[in-house]
Amino acid sequence: MQIGAATEGVEADLSVNAEPDVKPIAKMLSACVGSVITTLTVTPLDVVKTRLQSESISQYSSTQPISSAKILGKGRPAPKPLGGPVSGLYQIARHEGVRSLWRGLVPSLTMLLPANTVQFLGYEQLLPLYSDWGFPAAAAIAGASARTISATIVSPIELFRTRVQAVGGHYPPGHAREIANEVFDGLKLMIHQKGILNLWSGVSVTLWRDVPFSAFYWWSYERIRLFLLGHPSLQAFSSSQSTKDLYINFVSGGISGTLATLLTQPFDVSKTAKQVHGHTLTRGQFMLTLWKRGGPKALWKGTLPRCVKVAPSCAIMISSYHLTKKYFSESVDAY
C-alpha cells in the first residue's frame, strides 16, 4: 500500500519500537508508577484550575453547583475568589490549609491508575496495528482510541473528584469527611432523580476534550521525539543513552501536552461546568452561553493553571513510564 510505504520509515522509529518489549504486567506497573508520581506533583494545580473555572462558570450562570447548594443553604459563606493560578495556591494554603491543595487526591489516584494503564497499554497495542494497516497519522488514531476507552471507564470517578475540588472551599480546613459526604449525598440525589447513567453526565464533554487532546498529543509527541532524536545538539548532551531518552521523553511530553491543552481548553471549561453545576444544557449551549456572557476569555478560563498542570503532568508521566519500563526490560528474568 502506498500510504504504508510512505510512513514505514517514520513508524519504524516510533516510541513503541524504541525499547525492548516487556510483559503486560510490567507495563501496568510502569503506568501505575508514573500515575502516582504525576498525581502527587500536579494535584495542587488541578485544585486551583477547577476552582478558577468553577468561579468563572458561577459568574456567568444563575445556578449554584449541585453538590454545594445544601452547604450554602446552611449559611456557609462562599470562598473568597482566587486571584490567579499562583496566588490561588497561596490563598488556598493560607485560608484552607496546605492539605487542601491535595483535595481529591484519593479519587485522582483511583481515576488515573486505571485510566493511564488502559491509555498506555492500549496505545502501545493499537499503534503497531494501525501502522501495519497503513493508516496515516497512526499515532493520533491510536491515542484517540485508547483515550476513548479509558475516559469512559473512569468518568464517574472524575465526576466525584471534580465536585470535591469545586465545593471544598466552602468548608474550613480538616473537613474532608464532611466534603466527601456532601458530594456523595448530591450524587445519590442525582441518581435518584435522573438515574445512574447520569454518573456519566460529563463523559461526552470529556470525550470531546480528551479524544482530540490525546490524538494531537500522541501525534505531536512522536514527531517532536523524532526531531529531538536527530538533533545534533543532543549528541553532546550526555554520553548516557538512558539520560538522552529521559530528556527526549520529558521535553516531547511537555511540549505536546501544552499544545494540546491550548487547542482543547474550551472543552475543559464546558466539562467542568457540566460536572459541577449539573445543567441540562448541551455542550454547545454551555459554550455559547459562556461566550455571550464572558467572551473568549470565559472559554479559555483556567488555561494558564491547566497548562502549568498538564505540561509537567505529561512530561513526568511519559518519561517515568518509559524509564520504569526500561528498568523492567533490564530485569526481564523477574517478570
From Swiss-Prot:
Residues in Solcar repeats: 22-129, 134-227, 244-327
Domain of life per record: Eukaryota
Main location: mitochondrion
Keywords: Membrane, Mitochondrion, Mitochondrion inner membrane, Repeat, Transmembrane, Transmembrane helix, Transport
Subcellular location: Mitochondrion inner membrane
Membrane disposition: Multi-pass membrane protein
GO biological process: glutathione import into mitochondrion; import into the mitochondrion
InterPro entries: Mitochondrial_sb/sol_carrier (IPR018108), Mt_carrier_dom_sf (IPR023395), Mtm1-like (IPR045315)
One GO cellular component term noted in the UniProt record for this chain: mitochondrial inner membrane
GO MF annotation: an example: glutathione transmembrane transporter activity
Transmembrane segments: 28-48, 104-123, 133-154, 195-219, 246-263, 307-323
Stated family: Belongs to the mitochondrial carrier (TC 2.A.29) family.
Entry protein name: Uncharacterized mitochondrial carrier P23A10.06
Species name: Schizosaccharomyces pombe (strain 972 / ATCC 24843) (Fission yeast)
